[in-house]
Amino acid sequence: MFFVDNDYDESLEGISPDLYETPCYSIENLYAQKEVFQDIIQAEFGINQAHEDYKRCIDDYEKRCEEFVQGMEEFNALAYMRRQKTDSNSDVKFGSVKTSHLFDISVHQIVKSSHYAEEIEKIKKALDVTDTELTDSIKKLRILGDPVVKYRGKNQLDFFCSLLKQLKEYNNSGGYFSVKHNCVKLNITGNRLSELSQYALTPESLEAFLHSHFVLLAS
């Protein structure tokens, strides 16, 4: 069995029955989802759905998520354009651009970083992109569907984890939650995919893929 991220490449679906391609940009997108956030607030913060703090957390997450994906449109359009031009990563290393160099992320607002313009201009120059080409790429990107699913997963998960970490800090310092929640177990490090794996969404297509292969192995 082989697992690959879709990225912005042409779909590999159907090439081999042993190949599974993510239905989103990458595996990280399966973590950075509202449903996952809801589960973590309940399980790791010990806040049930009936509590006023739960509603506040979810409301703020939804607002900040919308702001973040709107802000990341230009960056993702450039990443999409690079994939259309070449499958080489030699021109621009999108993965090396820190999300914190694009946006300052907080529970209260999403603001462009002071480095944003510099980072975007460097990419545009490296790709030799015109404003017209960028506009066309943005239009094509919008057709792909939900940005939370189709935008670069690493950046989406950076945003997701930043909010969770800040909520944990606010629980310790006060000023956000109505009460201090004493059962917060959340700990996110550089090993975040493993640490949050129990909460990640499992697409139906992945369940079907695994089931079919387990049946073959058992036969």
Model-flagged regions — what are they?
Residues 1-219:
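Acidic, divalent-metal-binding catalytic cores of TOPRIM
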